[in-house]
Amino acid sequence: MNQNTETYKLGLISALCLTLAWATSAQAQIALDGDDIGGVVTSTDGPEAGVWVIAETDDLDTFFAKIVVTDDQGRYVVPDLPDADYQVWVRGYGLADSELTSANPGDTVNLDAIVAPSAAVAAEVYPAISWYAMMHLPTNDELAGLDGGMNYYLDKMKTNGCVTCHQMGNLATRTLSEKLGEFDNSEQAWIRRVQSGQAGATMLNRLAADLQGIPFKYLADWTDRIAAGELPTFVPDRPQGLERNVVATVRDWASPRAYMHDLSSTDRRNPTVNAYGDIYGSPENSTDNFPILDPVNNTDTAFLATVMDENTPSAGDVAAVQPSVFWGTDRIWTSQANTHNPMLDQDGRVWYTARVRAPNTPAFCQEGSDHPSAQAFPTARTGRNLALRD
């Protein structure tokens, strides 16, 4: 053994001892209650500040995860956990996701973070918007025939269009599934893709008619560049300052085939109403089994919303335009009530805007009725009405 090798080994051992000594010192400063999990996150670069520690479990009636952020010394505390067996892991910008570590409330668990071996691995956990921002925009000449121009285009491609329903830029949207089929180019693949499922007609109409087909070129270019290895130019910062005080609790409720359009837990005019009470979901077109979450006991129940008229239209009447890569041709959306906007009043009663009958209104609502409301504002057809959960 030569002297250089001995020096290297001694240096490595010294660094390891210093890291262990630092972690032990930092750990000693963490006060835990019996329902907390805490410890220190370190990597080969030392303590990892501003990274997320996730404690998750399937032991409860709902899938449950609580997420916290490490401080400047890499310390974390996941507080006030229900009694269960947890898997704890680390995610952070500049890191690859860590291995899962088993833990229970009351445990001190020091976690090993993994420095991302490449920029591509690091970018896998960047926010979806980092990836979506890579999409190029059409030229003014291309938009010359579009009423509203770029403002209208962006509105439909962002808040009032694609992003209304999809997390554009996540892994599912920034890649093209092989299950879609074989195509001459990615533009054709995107034209096929947006016809998937029961919303296929809506998506195709938005892009092909409202936006005159312009987005297909740019969607294709976007996914082609990503497939070729291009990465986001926007590299997000880790949480700083007060951002590190945020504790997020996530529960998976309702059905895998349903989606949540809205939820409500209180009267927004008086947010003390229904404190620690149930949270009421609105699944819009997907189902008439309205989900209810008990956030204290972590239970997931539902109530069946009924309509007044058996001829009320149903989302299940709409077939998939093309098969979904996830659900095939299944009509996974079946709602008649098609609710939005759950609201609680001052007494904790739950209100919805809901469809309760076919669109044609009763005669007393229409032109020629002597009803005061009809005389002021006659209506021949309506969509949603105000409904109360009884």
Language-model-derived ranges and their functions:
Residues 31, 58-77:
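Short, acidic Ser/Thr/Gly-rich low-complexity loop/linker segments typical of extracellular
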Residues 57-63, 85-102:
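A short, solvent-exposed loop/turn motif at the edges and junctions
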Residues 274-275, 344-347:
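Residue-level detector of Asp-centered blade-edge/turn motifs that repeat once per structural unit
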Residues 241-259, 301-334, 380-390:
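Surface-exposed loop and turn segments in beta-propeller and other repeat-based domains
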